[in-house]
Amino acid sequence: DPDTIDWLEQNSGLPVIDHWWQTELGWPAIATCIGLGDRRRKRGSAGLAVPGYEFAILDDHGKPVAEGDSGNVVIRAPLAPGAFRTLWNNKAGYEKNFATFPGFYETGDAGYRDLDGFLHIMGRTDDIINVAGHRLSTGQMEQIVASQDGVAECAVIGADDPIKGMIPIAFVSARTGHDGDEALASRTVEAVRDELGALAALKKVYVVPQLPKTRSGKILRNLLRKIVNSEPFEIPPTIEDTSVPAAI
């Protein structure tokens, strides 16, 4: 989040050096490798590929996309030493990581590479929705929604649509004493439209008592997707409050 990094640098007087890694990799794969003499940083980027990792940005058909265009973040196989070589009791799951894009490890993240080679991670591919052929980051929308007065927590998900493929829907948990559900929803829709354009405009904002979360605080977005798409779902064993889905 560039705004958070800017705030931290301004208030601490120290540089914030970002990086990106996964448990499966055992080591940062995108970083600013100061020890190699390259101190370049770019706002909003995790950095450059660490030596030993070769990244590519591919579309859903496995074709490379142009610099600046978002796509699936993958790493050429074989992975560097220290990366995972199996998944415990889940050989099929391990193999699936390399099957979607033959010759590459599928990170499950979406992002893009800019003209200078810096890699920008937009979020999980599950959090990227395809609206009328355009890939939109729900994370960007959530930042705007969360910044609205009266919003305590939020989640933006993609609802199925017969014409556009998907449309963005927001679930909002309001703060005590906010200015009414309809006013809050209207302000939120307007704010997202103003900052991201009509294509990313929220189709609907649902103000709900609570959002479904795990006991560790992670919002169960997949559960919200199933609810809004009228799909059958099971209550996850990790959910914090089993009454929340019924209330939504």
Annotate each predicted stretch with a short phrase:
Residues L58-D59, T107, R113, K213:
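Hydrophobic alpha-helical segments, especially N-terminal targeting/anchoring helices
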Residues W21, G47, D109, G133:
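Active-site glycine-centered loops adjacent to acidic/histidine catalytic or metal-binding residues
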Residues D1-R41, E54, H61-K63, W88:
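Gly/Ser/Thr-rich phosphate-binding loop
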Residues V205-R215:
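Short proline/glycine- and acidic-rich turn/helix-capping motifs at secondary-structure junctions
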Residues D38-S45, K96-A99:
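Short, P/G- and charge-enriched loop/turn segments at secondary-structure junctions
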